[in-house]
């Protein structure tokens, strides 16, 4: 296939840290690739967004130092395996900078995915706890958007549609 695979678990568990991302960057050094295909949840997606703007010699600190001038180095395709966060369509990655003692976002227009692919079948095997927390998150976002003082007819339409999709899933899981 001519592709390189990288499993986040090899580099640590939980939320992404600078140490984890730097280890992945070290692992990728010397490998030539044009695109990143991220299949996973929030940690995988956040790491992929960082990798898409990283040059071959970068460390996490380098990216934060030049955040205002980041450029896309690799095409980014995101396939989320959880529902509700919307991370596949945002341009922010939250990294716990353990070496600095802060948890802060890395934000750049260059971090938007080139494509986001939603595959409902990937959600069918979600453990109940993951489904529950991520779908509640999505439901809260939908209600929040609907009730916002800045809501408009279009945003309310999307909010209503989101709830129309989420609530039957709950009925299916719970009943």
Model-derived regions: residue spans:
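General structural feature for long, well-ordered alpha-helical segments within catalytic domains
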Residues: 20-24, 29-32, 47, 135-138, ...
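A broadly tuned preference for mixed-charge, low-complexity surface segments
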Residues: 31-42, 86, 90-92, 133-134, ...
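Active-site segments that bind and position negatively charged phosphate/pyrophosphate groups
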Residues: 145-175
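N-terminal small/polar loop signature for handling phosphorylated ligands or for N-terminal nucleophile
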Residues: 1-59, 68, 172-175
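A glycine/threonine-rich phosphate-anchoring loop and its flanking beta-alpha core
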Residues: 56-153
């Amino acid at each position: 296939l001519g592709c390189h695979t990288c499993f986040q678990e090899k580099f640590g568990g939980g939320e992404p840290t600078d140490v984890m991302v730097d280890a992945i960057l070290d692992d990728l050094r010397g490998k030539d690739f044009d695109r990143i295909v991220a299949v996973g949840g929030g940690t995988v997606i956040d790491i992929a967004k960082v990798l898409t703007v990283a040059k071959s010699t970068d460390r996490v600190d380098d990216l934060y130092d030049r955040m205002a001038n980041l450029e896309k180095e690799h095409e980014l395709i995101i396939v989320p395996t959880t529902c509700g966060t919307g991370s596949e369509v945002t341009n922010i990655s939250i990294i716990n900078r353990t070496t600095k003692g802060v948890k802060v976002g890395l934000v750049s227009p260059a971090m938007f995915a080139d494509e986001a692919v939603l595959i409902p079948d990937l959600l069918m095997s979600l453990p109940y706890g993951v489904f529950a927390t991520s779908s509640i998150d999505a439901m809260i976002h939908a209600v929040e958007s609907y009730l916002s003082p800045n809501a408009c007819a279009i945003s309310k339409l999307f909010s209503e549609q989101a709830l129309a999709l989420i609530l039957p899933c709950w009925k299916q899981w719970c009943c």
